[in-house]
Amino acid sequence: MFDSKKFLANVTHDPGVYRMFDDKDTVIYVGKAKDLKKRLSSYFRANLSSKKTEALVASICRIETTITTSETEALLLEHNYIKTFQPRYNVLLRDDKSYPYILLTKERHPRITSHRGSKKVTGEYFGPYPHAGAVRETLSLLQKLFPIRQCENSVYANRSRPCLQYQIGRCLAPCVSGYVSDEEYNQQVGYARLFLQGKDQQVLDHLIGKMERASRALNFEEAARYRDQIQAVRSVIEKQFVSNERLDDMDIIAIAYKLGIACVHVLFIRQGKILGNRSYFPKVPENTSLSELTETFVGQFYLQAHQGRTIPNSIIVDRKLEEKAELESLLTDQAGRKVSIQDNIKGNKSKYLHLAQMNAQAALALQLKQSSLIHERYKELQQLLGIEKIHRMECFDISHTMGQQTIASCVVFNEEGPLKSDYRRFNIEGITGGDDYAAMEQALKKRYDKDLELEKIPDIIFIDGGKGQLNRALKVFHELQVKWDKNRPHLIGVAKGVDRKVGLETLIISKQEREINLPADSLALHLIQHIRDESHNHAISGHRKKRQKAFTQSGLETIEGVGAKRRQALLKYLGGMQGVKNATQDEIASVPGISVALAEKIFEALHH
């Protein structure tokens, strides 16, 4: 039992962070305090403030503290620890994806593209956007308004004539000399930059001036092009403006809570435009106040530096925060400029907070409906299989094209549905092409032939396939030499049947040695179809990426002595990869930088 008196006798009154551990030496809670002794003493009073705190204190076996120089430093360290340890009594933001941006590169002929992750590429970044779909939509729009290139540099550097994008008026073809001057191209780049910065009126003023000058010079064809561009830009501006009032860069955060589920809805506004919105469903311990939830969300959301998120000038929330000053100070330090958190909004901005609140309520209602349905599906599957409680399910599928670029996927469901952070793909190598049994065996060994934490052991493993695939899976598990209980998972084959029609699947249950055909309206079948389809889609998308990578590689990458510059020279002088393949050894040797010996090596590699 934890001796709180003995522990508290050695705690100082400094600011800092504390970590509470249970009997398994797992961090169960992380907190911070401006006075560690005072804060930690409050946990061991006779009358605790909530059942959540009572349950937490009952689980404590030891506590560690870290002294910091300030409250701000403690706040940052607290969020780093929460991110690292994922304690069960803390509010946890489960979405861990970095946000996508639009990147305008810094080159002679800049390109515009999407970017996610660390900002290593030199250029200007615009965003963040709430999801990849918003970036794709904006890029498509920009291409229609301002015809600048979006192609990769490898494509740009090796073109001898303009591509289809030039033919349909979506690129000025800077890749081929004589089609557009650097000045004209960079003018369109400037328009795109101003547009992304929200300076739409400047874009219009420039275009109107160009149109009028072309008209005065009797160049009516050029004037008509500018007129069409002006109309397109005006049409977009009318749709994108939030209001006539110019708004600061801001995020608006609203929270809805019901039946143990919280929805945090974020509305992103940049340069006076709504870039989009997104709903989050953090894991919230019982009896957590919504103010605490908001504070924790803001901290985790903006202080995870590796996410590449931009901190806006203003963050608007729908409730008062106790740690508002500390959060503002920390976010200001992180951003390198003044950041304000506003919790008492009036006037025009209040209607956007109301909009965020409406969206939070709507998203929560949908989530509750889906959670209820998933619960019913789990309940029916548990009854069908005679399992008291299903906590975790995993499903495997194989994807390839004619035995090439084989990928195996593993998707994971918990009681709330898909657990995408645990999804995995496996490259399958060293097998006969098209041997799905061998591919499944390799995938299962990669997944399970290692130590697993107790909560990571699945209750059910679905194998997308018939008896053959299931028998191969059983063989793998029989041969596993692992410490965890390999007999716990139920291995179930999902066979499509003779007609391979959806709804006519046969379940082959290994432990019960029986086969089941469920009716089309079975909730258990719907759950199985959901996880099977997720696995199928995950495998196909991974296979397509691998196939596309193989397709786009020239075949020169693996030849020793052929680096990026020599590869580029070969493609340029011989007219692309087909020209390289058709070239004789002497023709290859005539390319600058390619010796006779290297030409022989290249020729042999491509033809043998």
Curated annotation (Swiss-Prot):
Could you tell me which residue ranges the GIY-YIG domain spans? 13-91
What terms describe the molecular function in GO for this protein? Answer: DNA binding; excinuclease ABC activity
**PROSITE patterns for this protein:** GIY_YIG, UVR, UVRC
Which InterPro entries does this UniProt record tie to the protein? GIY-YIG_endonuc (IPR000305), GIY-YIG_endonuc_sf (IPR035901), GIY-YIG_UvrC_Cho (IPR047296), Hlx-hairpin-Hlx_DNA-bd_motif (IPR003583), RuvA_2-like (IPR010994), UVR_dom (IPR001943), UVR_dom_sf (IPR036876), UvrABC_protein_C (IPR050066)
Q: Locate the UVR domain: which residues?
A: 201-236
Q: What does the UniProt record say this protein does?
A: The UvrABC repair system catalyzes the recognition and processing of DNA lesions. UvrC both incises the 5' and 3' sides of the lesion. The N-terminal half is responsible for the 3' incision and the C-terminal half is responsible for the 5' incision.
List the NCBIfam families hit by this protein, alphabetically.
PRK00558.1-5, uvrC
Q: Which PANTHER family match?
A: UVRABC SYSTEM PROTEIN C (PTHR30562:SF1), UVRC/OXIDOREDUCTASE (PTHR30562)
Protein's name according to its UniProt entry:
UvrABC system protein C
Q: Which organism is it from?
A: Mannheimia succiniciproducens (strain KCTC 0769BP / MBEL55E)
Gene encoding this chain? uvrC
